[in-house]
Amino acid sequence: MRLDSFPASISVPYEVRSGFQAQGGLPSPSGHTSLRVSVFDSCFCTEVLPHGMYPVYLTGILTDLHEEHSQSSFLGINFRDGDKRSQLADVLREYNVPVIDYPRHFEGCPVLPLSLIQHFLRVCEHWLSTGNNQNIILLHCERGGWPSLAFMLSCLLIFKKLQSAEHKTLDLIYREAPKGFLQLFSALNPMPSQLRYLQYVARRNISPEWPPMERALSFDCLILRAIPSFDSDNGCRPLVRIFGRNIIGKNASTSNMIFSMPKKKTLRHYRQEDCDVIKIDIQCPVQGDVVLECVHLDLDPEKEVMMFRIMFNTAFIRSNVLMLNSDDIDIVWGSKDQYPRNFRAEMLFCELGGISPARPPTATLNGDMKGGLPIEAFSAVQELFNGVDWMESSDNAAFWLLKEFSANSLQEKFQKLILSDMEELSKFQAKVGLQIPLMSPLDSDEEKYSVASDSVSSSEHEKVQPGGNSSDSENINHDLTTEDTASMGNVLVNTPSVLPPTTPPPCGSLSILSTDENQLPPEVQHESPSDRKLPSPSPTAAAPPPPPPPPPPPSGNKPAFSPPPPPPPPPPPPLPQSNYASSQPPPPPPPPPLPNCLVPSPPPPPPPPPILPNRSVPPPPPPPPPLPNHSVLPPPPPPPPPPSLPNRLVPPPPAPGIGNKFPAPPPPPPPPRSSSRTPTGAATSSKGPPPPPPPPLPPANRTNGPGVPSAPPPPPPPPPANRSNGPSAPAPPLPPPLPAAANKRNPPAPPPPPLMTGKKAPAPPPPPPQAPKPPGTVPPPPPLHGASGRPHPPSSKGLNAPAPPPLLGRGREATGSAKGRGIGLAQQSNPPKKASLKPLHWVKVTRAMQGSLWEDAQKQGNQARAPDIDLSELESLFSTAVATNASEKGGTKRGSAISKPEIVHLVDMRRANNCEIMLTKIKMPLPDMINAILALDTSVLDNDQVENLIKFCPTKEEIEMLKNYNGNKEMLGKCEQFFLELMKVPRVESKLRVFAFRITFSTQVEELRTNLTTINDATKEVKESLKLRQIMQTILTLGNALNQGTARGSAVGFRLDSLLKLSDTRARNNKMTLMHYLCKLLSEKLPELLDFDKDLIHLEAASKIQLKLLAEEMQAINKGLEKVEQELAASVNDGAISVGFREALKSFLDAAEAEVRSLISLYSEVGRNADSLAQYFGEDPARCPFEQVTSILVIFVNMFKKSRDENARTAELEKKKLEKDKEKATLSAKKVLE
């Protein structure tokens, strides 16, 4: 046999399986690794060699080992079953190889006690560190010992710091065996308990003394939250057994069963529909390693089904509580779905000196104590309530209570209280554990661990006779103490080196003996438990009102060829589209460009001005280029059309090529009636259909513009009436055909609004500016000299005529040359880019309502004219870019700002901005902040700031990104600098979470302690109130008086929810309830009982507390302490940066553990008192939890007080009425006498 490589398959069973690498613990192809630990392949096989073949197999392997590793010494470690002598020890003794035998389980769990784990680790560490680092350890296990061998090997890897992750290490070793190999030897999944002990090993750096001293504790109770399903009723009948060291009996060093519930048919059955909490009182002292088994006892007492198993050590129970979920307990393979998702096992402990004495049974209200009034006092009630049925109490108090309060304001509260998880409930078990005698000793109740070395040979001791010489052996009782471990180390140190088999010197054989353990785990059985689519809007509703005519705002523009909604009547026509617009969406019509007729003949006429919408708006124009913010201002009023001029003033045709590419100006708004004036200027070609027009003008009044062949006529203005032609989808509706007399070759220009009769046109406004050219269009030539003599468009008198929009993109000169006039100035299109104005975020009105001031402003003309606005002043005050004063700041600073290198951002900009905002709230340098975190200084950082720091801890991707950045780190942004500072601290997020827990710990503990104290006080007040006791007895006597002679009579007590029915039972006159009668009776007979509510001052506050929430808070505190403990252990390897952090955390942990320990004691006491309160009223805590008891009592107290006050008011009114009647009688008597 050779150790050169691993076998290709596990099916080759008997070879030495070579060790595990020092890095990562992975199998190495070479037989000699730094760990120098080898595992026999027989440990991975289920086959059994025929009798006599096993020594031959071992002899062959050992011969090869001595040949290949002649300079090495070997140590054999065997995990054996029971106390019988192993064949491995017999064979290895012949080669002078010492063997240590360990048990393969502890009370059925494949985890060895912590003292044996410590012994194993020290032995391995000592052996591997001697012999010039050439010694080798041979691991072997007998049949069924693989789970223990894998666990101990994992402990060694973590102890030697070759692995750090417990779960990964254990899983890594288990994967060396065939799939399903672990399930063959363990009916339960042992990994949760094994991981718990691996964590014990991994946390050895927390305290200089490891393992810590095993504390003697009293196991108070076991609480199971959320009932697991192990039968057809979705419930279970749990039976708990505890194995460990009997610290009270004579054999304190041996392990046996120290607690067991009575195995009887009357064992309580818990169902999920009845309750969700199982509480089992244990009251058993424990110390050291403890195994807890919970089995489900079927109706057949002999049939047990294993539910779960937990193994733990009391030395690592820091806060007297151990809370585990379904992932932390050993359960049957594949039974995870039998446990609810929120299942939790809580084990509560207290100090051994504080173990509670055996509690007497809780005194109930309806016991031997008598009180209240005799039944003779209720003679009147039988007549008063004769014929009124005393309501039967339901068997299900919770259901009845929910139904009873479904019609009042407390319905929601009681639904939550009754139907929610019922907490801290289980059938009261009065000191079951202390009344059960210990079971008869089994064969394996006592285990003896002994180390044999150099003593006289005997029949009970192992014998080594190499070369015919007998070696002495000495039997040393091993009681699992540290001293014995040290002695074992000394024995191994003195062990001589291995010599050839022919002449080996005498050598001690090391063996840890244990009695044969024939007790098998209980039989494990498993039983299975039984767009909404939004409606499409109509075309009319889908389209919002179109924007006003040019210049339009960017957000309201749509392509002219998109399907428009029916235009609102009367719509003004949109801009005619050019050939360019037919292939792609054209730009929006800017302020009117120079007309097509500018080129051939001077002087060119000014273009038509923008259209002012009157009562309707056209379909949206094509999307425009980006406009400045102030382009959303209201549209200006239209400039007046040109006056009627002679034919000689008609402009010449446009230049060639312009008519097909340049968009035509929009027509002026329609007149209220037909106009005889003829406009100037020629229309351009338009391919897009215009919106519905008004009736066409007479052909005789139109003058055609020459030079535009075969161009369709532009749309005329819409009519004033609310009529419109039907639209044709998807394009806007076409205008009606022109009159027959119209010239088809030369279409007429759109008509302007008529001049008002008898009015004289004012002076013409300045010419319009030039609009920015859309792509693909040919810019028109500039205006010719002498344009001042060109005709100007007039306006009707009385109308506010603003100037055409200024030139776009021409800077301040263009803007300043055209001063605004009234409302028309507000609709500037594309102001200069150098002076972008801040927007006024108003809600624009696109259609003036009839009778509004906006409509009046358009009609009044100059009377309501707004003052002229100086745009230069407006730009200097409301410019988006801060204007710089050249005389003050100069150009040098501007140049330096441009040359300044840009900040490098590696993190997402949104996250970086949020991080910088967060950092501005923490006003301190980053190094100081890191020092405050490491010092756990709560005076510098509060909880909110720490939580924000946790949110902005760098992710793995961000850390890699920053590590790979090779540029100048000083040029990184603030967020990146912050991340770099955090990266200097190992596990900074974990430290921040510990810091956050440190900040909130005091508040959490104080709030929890206050709530627990409130429950205790309320329970004590209720149970010690003599007045409440007498009132309950009075109610019992009252009910028996009403039910006398019926099946409901002669009751010895009543259910607690019957208190709520006192107000539902009314007298025959319907003026009084039984609650009123009770108060009346007490006020007459026992008035001192009326103020019994003063004895229950904490009852209402306790009714608002839920034990389930308290349990969750307790678990959160306990988990937080575990995280603190883990971080403290991990920070040992951080170096100097975490020295102060470890000191501060260790100080906090010591104080916090003491605080939580006292809190756990109070929490356990509260649980017992909450159960006893239900038992005080004769209720089952599982069916009537503490929350329901207190809520019923609070409601009863409030109803009693209300009835008492109503009786007092009624008595006062009757008294006044009697006084008035008496006065009337006196007056009547006087009148009679007179």
From Swiss-Prot:
Gene3D superfamilies: 2.60.40.1110, Formin, FH2 domain, Protein tyrosine phosphatase superfamily. Residues 524-534 have a biased composition (Basic and acidic residues). Residues 214-352 form the C2 tensin-type domain. Keywords: Hydrolase, Protein phosphatase. The active site is at residue 141. Residues 827-1226 form the FH2 domain. GO terms for molecular function: phosphoprotein phosphatase activity. It comes from the Eukaryota. SUPFAM superfamilies: (Phosphotyrosine protein) phosphatases II (SSF52799), C2 domain (Calcium/lipid-binding domain, CaLB) (SSF49562), Formin homology 2 domain (FH2 domain) (SSF101447). Residues 1-208 form the Phosphatase tensin-type domain. Residues 443-478, 492-840 are annotated as: Disordered. Residues 498-507, 536-576, 584-656, 663-673, 688-699, 709-721, 729-739, 762-784 have a biased composition (Pro residues). InterPro entries: C2_domain_sf, FH2_Formin, FH2_Formin_sf, Formin_homology_domain, Prot-tyrosine_phosphatase-like, Tensin_C2-dom. PANTHER family: FORMIN-J (PTHR45733), FORMIN-LIKE PROTEIN 14 (PTHR45733:SF17). Belongs to the formin-like family. Class-II subfamily. This is Formin-like protein 3. It comes from Oryza sativa subsp. japonica (Rice).
